[in-house]
Structures are given as structure tokens and as C-alpha cells.
Amino acid sequence: MGARASVLSGGKLDAWEKIRLRPGGKKKYRLKHLVWASRELERFALNPGLLETSDGCKQIIGQLQPAIRTGSEELRSLFNTVATLYCVHERIEVKDTKEALEKMEEEQNKSKNKKAQQAAADAGNNSQVSQNYPIVQNLQGQMVHQAISPRTLNAWVKVIEEKAFSPEVIPMFSALSEGATPQDLNTMLNTVGGHQAAMQMLKETINEEAAEWDRLHPVHAGPIAPGQMREPRGSDIAGTTSTLQEQIAWMTSNPPIPVGEIYKRWIILGLNKIVRMYSPVSILDIRQGPKEPFRDYVDRFYKTLRAEQASQEVKGWMTETLLVQNANPDCKTILKALGPQATLEEMMTACQGVGGPSHKARVLAEAMSQATNSAAAVMMQRGNFKGPRKTIKCFNCGKEGHIAKNCRAPRRKGCWKCGKEGHQLKDCTERQANFLGKIWPSHKGRPGNFLQSRPEPTAPPAESFGFGEEITPSQKQEQKDKELYPSTALKSLFGNDPLLQ
């Protein structure tokens, strides 16, 4: 502890112990705070010996300050302690930690102003003119043009061959053509061998923009004053009716006319149309597959979004809405739980395992568990659920645990239902009756649940007065059946039988 507490001594230690932790608070800094700061610096892999000097404290502050906003409370406390110690080393009188932070911020602002003034002085003393490629100043002070390098042209051709006209071609063209003249831009376009249909579309866009420029910038009537340059027309900006010297003069005049930047904007506008033609997929059609990782889906989404010709506000709305809406059900459930304010990093972290083997196994297990539970519930509701099986019973001896086929007792004679001999169980007349209350088969006639007689359709009978009528055999059978089976007619079940009326 002695080595750690030896950071301050004498008057500095007295000044340290007079500073309050909080404005208006009672607690003040003590030696234990220096010991704690030394241990924290070791934990953050910083040298605790830096606390002994003001320069060392300044180095520690420079390391800790970028992480203050996202750091923990311990990191902020360490930063406040080192800032207060810096004021003690510099013999700046402060009353509390808040005042020490304000003093330190003032010192940092003064240091920044000094550096800015020094940089401005160095720039003023430097007599060399800035070299803005491809237009540079030679030793005689003249503005000359350096032709675009073959390496740049080779990089541009390689991008077109590999990427065709995908969305990343536009920023690549913008980077390679930085500060180029219209002649340089035409050289880059002429090196494109294939894709002549796209080049023709680009020429049409350039011609349209040149005509619009001529309409908005009409030529002034009268002769041009001596020493003045003519104003560029649309064809001059496109490099078809202007020389390289005129282009350099326009770009370096006071005030300058940036013909190269204007022509570059026209080309980028045409490239946007070509990219949209070569990327026919709409952002509305980008949907995550059921087994596609969320990272691959996000890559496809933003690649298609770059090709969309829309404002930044519209693209922001597409990102907030469609990215979640077009995700698969698993990821969509997770993303909706995160809320609308979730960052892309949080989304990708939350959906990192979706679609992998472990996630598939977990989803399959949950689905099988739900299916099993639902099937069991349906069986219980329908009454199909069978409880424990009933104990079998022997028909021969009447004991449980075996059937008559395996029974060791003497075989019982006669019917197993009524016990009488002369017939078997299947022919026993003491079995359960049918729904009309009669045993079937009967010895004669139709089954009990059928009509016992069926009238045959005949012509109407002749009038009879009952003299000498003969009773036919069929009528005798009908009367006999009525006496034997009085309850088998439909009248006994459903009221009056129309066939018997």
C-alpha cells in the first residue's frame, strides 16, 4: 500500500484531501482513492506509475475519455479520479470533482486551439501549391494535366468485368474518378468493351442532361469581353466540343466552373438507371427463406436496397418496415420482441442461431411436444383414450388371468351361457334380443325387425258381399302371423301403419 499511496506527498497530498467527492458533499478524497485508482489501472492494463505526473495523468485521460459514454460506473469513477489528480499536479485549485472536470475541459480546449493555430501558420508559410490530381501545378506555376494512370483504368475495367453493373459499381466509379476532367471520364467510359446496350443508355442520359443544362444556362448575347472565357455548353461539359485546355481553365478559374464534377453527376445518374435495369429484383420481393440465416438475408436486403432509386428517407422507412416484415416466422417473432428501436447489431445478435442445427432441433422438439399434447387432448375428448387394460376371464372355469383355450380345468360341457347341453353358445336362445325384443333366428318367418308380410300389388278386387267367400292360404298365413307376432308391425313403433289400414 505504501508504494501505491506514494503518488502524492507534502502540499499536494494536503490539497488532495481538501477536494470533495461531490459538490456540497461531506466526503473528501483520501489515500484509499489513490490505491483504488492504481488497482483499476492495472485491471485495465495501464501503468499505475503514470499517476505520479501530470503528463501521465493526461495520457490516462486520453485513453479513458473515448470510452466514457459507453463505459461502466467504475470507469467513470476512475476517469473522475484521474482528472482531479491532474488538477492537483498542475496546482489548479478546485473544490470538488465537478469543478476539476470543468477545468480539465478548459485545458483541453486551449490545447486544441493552439494546435489549430499552429497548423494554420504552417499552411500559410508553405509556399508550395496544393497538388490536386489530375490537374497539378508545375515548377513554372502553370496548371497542367496528368493523364489518368493505366492502373486506374485497369481497376475500372476489372470491376465492370466482375460486377457488371451491380450497385457497388457506382461508388467504385466515384472513387476512381475523383477530380477527373471530362476527357478522363470519357476515357474511362471508352475502356468498357462489352455491355454496349448499357453504354447506349448512358449516352442517352448524358444527352438529356446536356439539353437540360443548355435550357437553364442560355448563351448571353454579344461578344465575349477580352480576357474572359466563354461559358461552357452541355456538349462542352460532356467533353465533345471542348479541348483539354478549356476544361482545365474552367476548373481552375476564379470562380471555378467544375465541369468535371458536373459531368460526373450526369454519368452517375445514368449508371443508376443501368443498375436498376441490371437488378430487376424489387426490395419488396426480398424475403428470408425458411432455412436461410438472418445474416445472408440482411446482405441480400441491403444489396437490393442500394439499387433502389429512392430518397434516403424512403430507404430508411424500407429498412425499418420491410426488414422485419419479410423475415421468416422464427426471426420475425424475435425481432418483434426486440421492439422498433432495436439496432441492426442487436437484430443480428438475437437471430444469430436461427436456422442452425441447434435451433432446428429445439423447434422440432417443441413442435413434437405440442403435437403429442394436442393428440392426447383430442383422444381424451373423444373418449378414445384407453385406460389400463381389463383383466381377461376364462369362460371355462370363470377364473381371471387366462382364457378358455389355455385353461387346465376339465372342459365344461354344454352351453357356456345357459349351461344346458345340446347346443353351443352361438346357438343359445338366451342371448340378448334384438331391438324389437325378439330372438332371431326364429324357426319360421322373416327376422323380427322386418315386416312379416309384404302385400303384393294387384288389381282392385271385385265387390263382395261376404256370401260364400273363400279364405285363401295367404290370408290364413297373415292372420296366423298377426297372432304370433302382434308387436312386429310398424304400428307398435311409429303409430298407425298405413299398410294395415
Curated annotation (Swiss-Prot):
UniProt KW keywords: AIDS, Capsid protein, Host cell membrane, Host cytoplasm, Host endosome, Host membrane, Host nucleus, Host-virus interaction, Lipoprotein, Membrane, Metal-binding, Methylation, Myristate, Phosphoprotein, Repeat, RNA-binding, Viral budding, Viral budding via the host ESCRT complexes, Viral nucleoprotein, Viral release from host cell, Virion, Zinc, Zinc-finger
Coiled coil: none
UniProt-annotated stretches for the region Interaction with Gp41: 7-31
Transmembrane segments: none
CCHC-type zinc finger segments: 392-409, 413-430
GO MF entries: RNA binding; structural molecule activity; zinc ion binding
Motif (PTAP/PSAP motif): 457-460
Residue segments, region Disordered: 102-129, 440-501
InterPro entries in the record: Gag_p24_C, Gag_p6, Lentvrl_matrix_N, Matrix_HIV/RSV_N, Primate_lentivir_Gag_pol-like, Retrov_capsid_C, Retrov_capsid_N, Retrovr_matrix
Pfam families (UniProt xref): Gag_p17 (PF00540), Gag_p24_C (PF19317), Gag_p6 (PF08705), zf-CCHC (PF00098)
Domain commentary: Late-budding domains (L domains) are short sequence motifs essential for viral particle budding. They recruit proteins of the host ESCRT machinery (Endosomal Sorting Complex Required for Transport) or ESCRT-associated proteins. p6-gag contains two L domains: a PTAP/PSAP motif, which interacts with the UEV domain of TSG101 and a LYPX(n)L motif which interacts with PDCD6IP/AIP1.
Note: HIV-1 lineages are divided in three main groups, M (for Major), O (for Outlier), and N (for New, or Non-M, Non-O). The vast majority of strains found worldwide belong to the group M. Group O seems to be endemic to and largely confined to Cameroon and neighboring countries in West Central Africa, where these viruses represent a small minority of HIV-1 strains. The group N is represented by a limited number of isolates from Cameroonian persons. The group M is further subdivided in 9 clades or subtypes (A to D, F to H, J and K).
Protein name: Gag polyprotein
Originating gene: gag
